[in-house]
Amino acid sequence: MKENRITRLVKQDKKLLIAYYMPEFPVPGATLPVLEALQESGVDLIELGMPYSDPIGDGSVIQDAAHKAISHGVHVGSIFELVRRARNGEGCKKITTPILLMGYCNPLIAYGGDCFMADAVKAGVDGLLIPDLPPEESEDFLERAKHFGLSVIYLISPVTPPDRIELIDSMSTDFSYCLAVNATTGTGKLDVAGMDEKIAEYLKRVRQHTKKKFVVGFGIKDRERVRKMWELADGAVVGSALLQHVATAKTPEETAELAAGFWKSLR
């Protein structure tokens, strides 16, 4: 079995800049041009959202994007097809960037666990982040993911106790994902303009109780915030800000152009 692209990525001595994108947002046909634009603009890893009608942990930006994606016919199978086309260079330049799917348990269960993982790997997916799947209840899931060669990422929050941080670190395949605030995504409550002491202390605590790398997301909108998160973590995730930036696009080409311009501004 070939080494997972995410595993290869985290072995590099670099700070990561990770994009979260909802497929076919804001217009049908936007996904492949956006993936190409992000890759050409220096993205390190791409999280693709799996839209769900009741995304409890997501803020209004991602909820709206999910509803629009669903209205454009996006479902698990269509995401696999988009990833397959991206990997084969059909409709865009060949995408070699690691791809992580992020979404809730229900669509995965409805598809069928092993079938989901087999089809994900066949399409070219590298990893999974399932926010509503607690590590304590996911030993079988983790074992099956390992069997299929998928990286699994778990979430850490500011209220996660040290012993649970250590558990999450041990169970995450390559890195953990830290929520910067105890809030829904994209709320913009992350006070990194003044480098909030609580966030700094929280991420220092995570560092003390982890052996693997960890990235931080939620509320990161510009180059200054990316840089400040890089000082405390191994990577920064930008999602809601990217979706907001492309939301007014009327065509796939305009979406890709806006995505590229925004992403270059973060570097």
Curated annotation (Swiss-Prot):
Q: What is its EC number?
A: 4.2.1.20
Instruction: Mention one GO molecular function.
Output: tryptophan synthase activity
Provide the active-site residues from the annotation.
Answer: E47, D58
Alphabetized SUPFAM superfamilies for the sequence: Ribulose-phoshate binding barrel (SSF51366)
Q: Which EC class is the enzyme in?
A: lyase
- What does the entry list under GO cellular component? cytosol
Q: Where are the transmembrane segments?
A: none
Tell me the Pfam families matching this sequence.
Trp_syntA
**Catalyzes what?**
(1S,2R)-1-C-(indol-3-yl)glycerol 3-phosphate + L-serine = D-glyceraldehyde 3-phosphate + L-tryptophan + H2O
Q: Which domain of life is it from?
A: Bacteria
Question: What pathway does the UniProt record associate with this protein?
Answer: Amino-acid biosynthesis; L-tryptophan biosynthesis; L-tryptophan from chorismate: step 5/5
Which controlled-vocabulary keywords does the entry list? Amino-acid biosynthesis, Aromatic amino acid biosynthesis, Lyase, Tryptophan biosynthesis
Q: How does it assemble?
A: Tetramer of two alpha and two beta chains.
Which family does the record assign? Belongs to the TrpA family.
- Give the protein's biological function: The alpha subunit is responsible for the aldol cleavage of indoleglycerol phosphate to indole and glyceraldehyde 3-phosphate.
What's the protein called, per UniProt? Tryptophan synthase alpha chain
Q: Record the organism.
A: Chlorobaculum tepidum (strain ATCC 49652 / DSM 12025 / NBRC 103806 / TLS)
The top of its lineage is: Bacteria, Pseudomonadati, Chlorobiota, Chlorobiia, Chlorobiales
